[in-house]
Each structure stands twice: as C-alpha cells, then as structure tokens.
A protein has these predicted regions:
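Short alpha-helix plus adjacent loop in nuclease-associated cores
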Residues: 96-145
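RNase H-like, metal-dependent nuclease domains and their acidic two-metal-ion catalytic environment used
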Residues: 1-98, 138-223
Length: 223
C-alpha cells in the first residue's frame, strides 16, 4: 500500500450472504488518517460505508476497491475470514494487516496466511473499546479546557451513524454495533505501535574462571 503512512481502514465483515429478514448485521468499513507530514487532516475519519449488499462478494469487492483506491491497508477480524481470503485470492494479501499485539513468529499458521485480528480475546476487546474512548476524548466535541486541542476548538467527526453507534456501544454485546467495530479497528490500525509487545531482554551471565598463578601450581580463585 502506497499510503500506509497516511492512514488505514478498519472493517467489520460478514460471511453469509442470505439471512432471515431483519436478523443480519451490516458490513461496515471506516477509513481514517493518522498523524503524518502530508498536507491533509490528521486523525480524521474520511470514509464511512455501512451496508449489506445482495451478496457478500459484492461487499468484499467494494472494500477491496476502497483499499486500493486510497492505497491504505486494512485491519479486520479473522474469525470471519472470507473477506481476508478474498483479498488473498485477488493478490492483495499485503493490504491485510497482521494483528499488532503479537510478533510475526508468534502468529498462528492462519494468521500468517491471511492476516487479521481475533475478536474473541478479552485483551483485544478491551484495547478496541479503549481506542474508541480515547479517540472520542481527544478529537470529538468541544475541548473546553484545551487539553488536547486549542481551548474551545470543535472536533470534526462528520458521520452521524458512527457517532450514534458509539453512543450506544456495549462492550459485553458487540454484535450489533457494526460501525463501532470497524471504526475502532481503524483507530487500532493507526496506533499499531501502542500494541506491539515489548521485547524481553534477558541478562546473559558469563563467569570466567580466574586462577592464582603466584605459586608453582595454578589454583582457581573461589568467589
């Protein structure tokens, strides 16, 4: 992706095309910029796509076209892997981000093959919710105290459906909050460095044997 340094996408996908009327959740895609030296707004949501086309393949292809058009990678859940396999089969595996909370050599075989992040892990759920919470605190609404922006400055979040979804979001029942899932994943994709595991440094103890050579026979010096 040529614009990976500018922003990322987050996606809440689905695998089954046909559902009982009123029962299926929508597919959701959000695009967001991150801090960069380019001449464009930072930490800004620029795309919202919430829909459920007639078939899942149409949704997958539209998500793929958005990623290629903007030249940005995507982070999505790998427990619904059809979207990730669609990217891989079309030759765009490099657009699918790996989970940021694990090193590459710790990923499972499937995670290495298609990328994505599981939504079953409690740590991932907490990180996702706190990412949305932090974004709202910093960039949505008026900053009266001037903590994160100029005092009295109004944040710019233009997507009403996403704002309403954030207001209702329930971490214990995430299924119906499609916009919150995808927007949170977009935020996480832009903040990968926050989830990178720290490398454990182990001290190597090297003890050299020391000898006393003052006599005819060398004697080892005990510590």
């Amino acid at each position: 992706p040529g614009n990976e340094h500018i922003g990322s996408f987050g996606c809440d996908s689905y695998d089954i095309s046909g559902v009982v009327v009123g029962k299926g959740s929508n597919g959701s895609l959000h695009g967001m910029t991150k801090f960069s030296m380019e001449d464009m707004p930072s930490n800004h949501f620029f795309l919202e796509y919430i829909a459920r086309p007639q078939t899942a393949e149409i949704f997958f292809e539209e998500v793929l076209m958005a990623c290629v058009f903007y030249g940005m990678p995507i982070l999505c859940e790998n427990n619904k892997p059809r979207l990730l396999y669609h990217f891989k089969n079309r030759g765009y595996r490099q657009f699918c981000l790996n989970r940021p909370d694990k090193r590459y050599n710790k990923l499972s075989k499937t995670e290495r093959e298609i990328g994505g992040i599981p939504n079953t892990s409690e740590d991932v759920k907490q990180s996702h919710a706190s990412a949305i919470e932090s974004y709202i605190e910093k960039y949505v609404g008026v900053d009266f105290l001037g903590t994160y922006r100029t005092a009295g400055d109004m944040g710019d979040m233009y997507f009403q459906r996403t704002l309403e979804d954030w207001a209702k979001f329930d971490i214990s029942n995430r299924t119906k909050f499609d916009a919150s899932i995808s927007s949170g994943l977009a935020i996480m994709a832009n903040q990968k460095h926050l989830y990178t595991p720290t490398k454990e440094k182990t001290k190597i103890s090297i003890n050299f044997a020391r000898y006393n050579n003052s006599e005819k026979v060398s004697r080892i010096i005990n510590k």
